[in-house]
């Protein structure tokens, strides 16, 4: 399954761990093909090692073809509109 992580201020430890499984396409942007177990274990490391926030986008069998999870970004949130995930910007 295709997975993309977008991280803000990730620690070197987390970046090193992610590069074992994924390509760092740009600083803080990791792309790879992971199984669900590895994806969930890596996502579980995010709160301790990327305190400013993170976004995960992964392929999913739904209308959009992907799903999103977000952590620690107070100005944005994920809104569900009839099964479609959208990014809501807080003002």
Residue positions per predicted region:
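Basic nucleic-acid-binding interfaces
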Residues: 2-91
